[in-house]
Structures are given as structure tokens and as C-alpha cells.
């Protein structure tokens, strides 16, 4: 399952890169994953410095993958 999630995200990234730029070298990696019954949930990111992260969900009943792509705008510490 890991390799399929990584492959889907990698293909998504390549499809959305600026075609006028040289293809950068990058890796896609799993940040977090869990399995509930026949379903999988993944959070993934890449070594590109674009602030993107990806959520992959595998529906085991339907044998389908779902991809959500997010842009991180800010990371801030809020003290108690």
C-alpha cells in the first residue's frame, strides 16, 4: 500500500510542476498512516520546498484511492 500511495502522489506532483522548468529531483515520503478495517489513510509530503502535503485515502470496499492536496501557509506556536 505504501508504494502505491507514494506513486500516486509522485505522479500528481509531476503532472502539476511548471512544464517550462527543468524536472527537479525529489522524493515523496509517508509522514503518517493508519488502517481502520479495510481502509487506509496516509499523510504524505515531498522534499520539494513548495509547502504542499497530501492526504491519501484507500477505500477497501470500493478498491479506490482518493487524493487531497493541501498547501501549508503557516506554522505558528500558540502558547497556553
Which sequence ranges carry the predicted segments?
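Generic preference for flexible, low-structure residues
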Residues: 21, 25, 60, 72-74
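Compositionally biased, low-structure terminal segments
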Residues: 13, 27-30, 71-74
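Short, non-transmembrane alpha-helical segments in secretory-pathway proteins
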Residues: 1-27
Amino acid at each position: 500500500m505504501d508504494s502505491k500511495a507514494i506513486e500516486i502522489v509522485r505522479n500528481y506532483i509531476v503532472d502539476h510542476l511548471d512544464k517550462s522548468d527543468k524536472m527537479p529531483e525529489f522524493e515523496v515520503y509517508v509522514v503518517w498512516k493508519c488502517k481502520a478495517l479495510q481502509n487506509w489513510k496516509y499523510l504524505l509530503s515531498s522534499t520539494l520546498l513548495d509547502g504542499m502535503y497530501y492526504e491519501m485515502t484507500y477505500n477497501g470496499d470500493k478498491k479506490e484511492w482518493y487524493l487531497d492536496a493541501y498547501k501549508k501557509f503557516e506554522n505558528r506556536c500558540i502558547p497556553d
